Amino acid sequence: MFEKAITRNTISLRKRVSVFLLAFISTLAFNIELYTSDPEEAYIHNRFFLFLYKLNSQLASSVSGKGSIIVAMTILFFFAFLYFFEIHPLIKIKGDTALSLFFSIMYAGGRGFAYNDSLSSLMIPRFNILKTIILVIGYGAFYLLLIRLLYTIMHTSKDISPKWPILHIYNKHPFFFVYIIILIMWSIHLIMRYPGAMSYDNWRQLAYYMGYDTYTTAQPIFHTWLFGTFIRFGLFIGSSNIGLFLFILFQSLLMAAVLAYTLLIMTSWHTPRWLRLLTLCIYCIAPYFAGYAAFPIKDYLFVVGLLLWTIEIISLLQKENKSWFLNKSETVLKDTSSTGNIPDLLHVFFWIIGAAFMILCRKNGIYIYILTSLFILILFLRHIRKSPREVLMSIIVLAIPVVLTSSIDTAITNHYNVIQDSPKEMFSLPFQQTARFVRDYGDEISDDDKEIISKVLDYDNLPELYSEMTADPVKTTYHAQNNRELYDYFSVWLKEFLQHPLCYIEATWNQNYYIFMPDMDNVVYNQDCYFGSATYQDIGFDKYIGFYIPSALEGASQTICSWYKMLNELPIIGRLNNVAFYIMLMFTVLLYLKHDFQKKNHEYLI
């Protein structure tokens, strides 16, 4: 205490004032809005005094009614910044200031898009330039504190030592103990949303599979086949509800198993108990896990595969020679606990299964796998020095998921005569940019360019079809007949980009701005099995399928979804259910890895 008192007294007044100003700016960043009202007419002719008058009036209106909150937050930030930046400074990490500024700039841009779907709101009216600077500096300081504080927490040796009697069961059966807990916690969600929550894509998949619509590759054909098979089984035994619920149960069992496996692996890595317990709580409570368990979308099984495969990548990188085919004398780095003694062949099996689900359930899965596998192959060649057999076996393992998934897709395609869909999904990004350009700068487009765009998209209706948050309305108008029309279109696309590059940046940023905004999300919870049924209502397909909610559960799905929305608004739990939180955490962890490993073992950054 005496040393800390001395440290406080040695902090200069200049530093204290600087910290106070930073705390005040951070407080303003949390409380200001981009809406700026016009001040009352004052009939001031002196430009300098008029500027000061408007500045004072607009600043006053920006913080009006928030005096008590601003005082409390400023005091809180002042002592937090003073303690962690000056009195007991946290560890500085190379690049942490740049990362925190990146986060704050992305957040400020997101605020602009949330306000009026444009970056112009950050500069117009001119007073908003000051607000933007406050947002960048204020949130930058806040993010810098969090980055350094989290690094300190992650590297502390302190841990919890619970003495709960039930832990003896966990110690004997760590995987099944966690697995059962997750399933028990999810069961209430599955029951209240029985038989499951549908979407427009799910109804299209069933229409493809049942022959009510052309079976195309617009949806992943394996997931369409798998989902349709469960529903057809339900119809066969007399209840489509049972078929849907069995599929929900199937994907929930898989996800819970993979999540339990992550905690098993974390134990073998000697991850602190508090972090494992926190992770388990997130798995059990956060709507991203519990809520989506009752939603049969393709992304769910994709995440199952991606997560399992990612675990195996990390496990592989921990091995000394980066190979599954070790000699008995070789060891696994840090992997000395009993839970880490998983046979290499089982790791290989998990690698194949995880990669297969990832590739089969989303079209971009194959690109993720191939790019990562090339990196892994380079590691093999660098570390495997002795046996050509190890090289050959490793290459075979890397190739199996590609061959397996290609064979499955080919078999389904041949059996159901699946038609190749147009490349509209691949071009959704440039299509969205073109639509925004037509909306904002349509008067600058020549007649020849209009004709070229019209051969690919519905040019006349693009301004009305353009939606800032989704490319679906625009890309569905794709109708190019040949590659020449596409080539001409992309020539126009490039020319328009050079004319107004900011327009293209805004189109892409506007569609995804929420991924760096921890206080905003675009999460949607489809409530029940009726959602999206209107897609094929005119041909009676919804009646043929016949999903229904039992009378005893009427209103249950709305109730549980309202619970999800309430959790999203809570200060801490809501952030754990926010996509921006996990994306920013990923960037932060990459920074930690780069710092900890410095010039060696950069393969962990994968």
Model regions and ranges:
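Membrane-interface alpha helices of multi-pass inner-membrane proteins
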Residues: 347-362, 374, 399-401
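Transmembrane-helix motifs of polytopic, lipid-linked glycan transferases
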Residues: 249-270
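Start-transfer (signal-anchor) and selected internal transmembrane alpha helices
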Residues: 1-29, 64-104, 128-186
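Membrane-proximal stem/loop segments at transmembrane-domain junctions that anchor or position
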Residues: 415-550
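Short acidic/glycine- and proline-prone juxtamembrane loop motifs at membrane-interface regions
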Residues: 291-301, 361
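Membrane-interface anchor segments at the N-terminal boundary of transmembrane helices
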Residues: 57-73, 242-246, 511-605
